[in-house]
């Protein structure tokens, strides 16, 4: 991957892609639940 086209970005390289949506629909609730479960460990009964 040398810079043979220096002015041009890679063709399919937008920020919001189907892959971005698929990653974040899994990653955002996962991080949320990990933080929630970690916080539950410190709740005193």
From Swiss-Prot:
InterPro entries: PSII_cyt_b559_bsu, PSII_cyt_b559_CS, PSII_cyt_b559_N. This b-type cytochrome is tightly associated with the reaction center of photosystem II (PSII). PSII is a light-driven water:plastoquinone oxidoreductase that uses light energy to abstract electrons from H(2)O, generating O(2) and a proton gradient subsequently used for ATP formation. It consists of a core antenna complex that captures photons, and an electron transfer chain that converts photonic excitation into a charge separation. With its partner (PsbE) binds heme. PSII binds additional chlorophylls, carotenoids and specific lipids. Residues 2-17 are cytoplasmic. Signal peptide: none annotated. This is Cytochrome b559 subunit beta. The modification N-acetylthreonine is found at residue 2. Pfam families: Cytochrom_B559. It comes from the Bacteria. GO terms for biological process: photosynthetic electron transport chain. HAMAP family: PSII_PsbF. SUPFAM superfamilies: Cytochrome b559 subunits. GO terms for molecular function: electron transfer activity; heme binding; iron ion binding. Its cofactor is heme b. Heterodimer of an alpha subunit and a beta subunit. PSII is composed of 1 copy each of membrane proteins PsbA, PsbB, PsbC, PsbD, PsbE, PsbF, PsbH, PsbI, PsbJ, PsbK, PsbL, PsbM, PsbT, PsbX, PsbY, PsbZ, Psb30/Ycf12, peripheral proteins PsbO, CyanoQ (PsbQ), PsbU, PsbV and a large number of cofactors. It forms dimeric complexes. Part of a photosystem II (PSII) assembly intermediate complex PSII-I; crystallized from a strain deleted of psbJ, it forms monomeric PSII before addition of the oxygen evolving complex. PSII-I includes 3 assembly factors not found in mature PSII (Psb27, Psb28 and Psb34). Residues 43-45 are lumenal. It is a single-pass membrane protein. Keywords: Acetylation, Electron transport, Heme, Iron, Membrane, Metal-binding, Photosynthesis, Photosystem II, Thylakoid, Transmembrane, Transmembrane helix, Transport. Its main location: membrane. The chain crosses the membrane at residues 18-42. Heme binds at residue 24. GO terms for cellular component: photosystem II reaction center; plasma membrane-derived thylakoid membrane. The keyword Membrane applies. It is found in: Cellular thylakoid membrane. Belongs to the PsbE/PsbF family.
């Amino acid at each position: 991957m040398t810079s043979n086209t220096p002015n041009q970005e890679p063709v399919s390289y937008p920020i919001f892609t189907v892959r971005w949506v698929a990653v974040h629909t899994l990653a955002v609730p996962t991080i949320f639940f990990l933080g929630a479960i970690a916080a539950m460990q410190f709740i005193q009964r």
